[in-house]
Amino acid sequence: MSKSRNTFIRASDFVKKFDPEFLRYYFASKLSNTIEDIDLNFEDFRKKINSDLIGKVINLLSRSVSFIKNNDYKLAINLSDENHYQNFVSRTENILKELHLRKYSSATKEIMKLADEANTFFNDNAPWKLDKDKDKKIIQEISTQAINYYKIIITCLLYTSDAADDV
């Protein structure tokens, strides 16, 4: 950032336009356990937030909740694929290790891999293709599993603490 090149922004101005949680995520995605400068490039910032947080994480929640809504917002007791879920959960251990070692960029990449996998799970199971009356239980289980994936992902995003508190 440079004041002379007009790429400077004050924190007070930034929070008027953007959620500070987005900036935390952006910086975390750039931070490693080495000392390096981080440039706040607004085009890169916009792309990363739109692609990662909105396109992957928020979209997963939005799509899965829309099916739960049709069931009076009740989650299923069982998941549609318990083995897939357990494998998903086990991968968070590596993310926690990366975070502990301050390898935030690496951890963020792994979290986004989980988000991709969660979205693939939801797309592959395609609850929108099932009969909403005949397959109601299956739709509820698929959607519940996707919501649980969302909770894991958002909890891993420690640096988006306000969002994690909402879960």
Across the structure, where does each feature detected by a protein language model lie?
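Catalytic adenosine-cofactor/nucleotide-binding cores of aminoacyl-tRNA synthetases and other
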Residues: 1-82
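Residue-level signal for inorganic ion chemistry
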Residues: 57, 111, 162
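An amphipathic alpha-helical micro-motif enriched in hydrophobic residues
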Residues: 114, 140-158
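Conserved small/polar residues in nucleotide/adenosyl-binding loops
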Residues: 159-166
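Long, non-coiled-coil amphipathic alpha-helical linker/lever segments
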Residues: 92-105
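Short, contiguous acidic/charged loop-to-helix segments that flank catalytic cores in large enzymes
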Residues: 98-101, 134-144
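Conserved, charged catalytic cores of large soluble enzymes
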Residues: 61-95, 115-136
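C-terminal structural cap/anchor segments
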Residues: 104-110, 114
